[in-house]
Regions:
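Bacterial Sec-dependent N-terminal signal peptides
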Residues: 1-24
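Transmembrane beta-barrel domains of Gram-negative outer membranes and organellar outer membranes
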Residues: 21-157, 164-168, 176, 180-184, ...
Length: 190
């Protein structure tokens, strides 16, 4: 074998360190990601959209339908005749729908005063930290209730407007830790 061929073979067979295979490329990518400011939003401030009989700060995500059957029982001291409150139970069947991640609507029917109801809940602010920092989540809630009971006294003027109730809430909540969240819900009922 001639010297130039031998030299060429040795050069081709000697492994070279390639920079493209440098393990620091992942580190460089991590540095780029850390350099970009990110926003972390608080999730699961509460586990559902309701707190007992009231609305929580939580919203359904876009396209989610949530059907709920809620019960309120009578008093336990009513005795065996009323089956300790079971006979006095009032029930509500409703469907809530997430139109967008910040807009939610719902319709329902309750056995209490034979009411039909509808509501809209809008997320105004969302708790976050990072690039966009917000200390709390704020939502607006508006609901309307329509009473369908028969009029008790048909001899007097019974106005349609007497059957309608409205409620407005400004729901403010903060998730302090995984185990503690606080919500305030100032309410106006008409």
């Amino acid at each position: 074998m001639t010297k130039p061929k031998l030299l060429l073979t040795l050069v081709l067979l000697i492994p070279f360190r390639l920079l493209a295979q440098d393990p620091n490329l992942l580190d460089m990518l991590d540095k780029e990601d850390k350099a970009k400011p990110s926003t972390d939003y608080a999730t699961a401030t509460f586990k559902t959209t309701r707190l007992i009989n009231a609305h929580s700060i939580e919203h359904l995500t876009s396209g989610v339908l949530d059907v709920k059957i809620s019960h309120r029982f009578g008093t336990l001291n009513s005795g065996f005749y009323e089956l300790f409150g079971l006979d006095n139970a009032s029930i509500r069947i409703g469907a809530d729908y997430g139109i967008t991640n910040w807009l939610m609507v719902g319709l329902g029917r309750s056995s209490f005063e034979k009411q039909y109801d509808g509501f809209t809940k809008v997320r105004l602010l969302r708790q976050s930290k990072g690039a966009k920092s917000m200390p709390l989540t704020l939502s607006g809630f508006a609901g309307m209730y329509y009473n369908t009971l028969k009029w008790a006294d048909t001899s007097r003027n019974n106005y349609y407007s007497s059957r309608i109730n409205y409620v407005f809430q400004l729901i403010a909540a903060r998730k302090f830790s995984e185990g503690f969240s606080l919500q305030l819900s100032p309410t106006l009922v008409h």
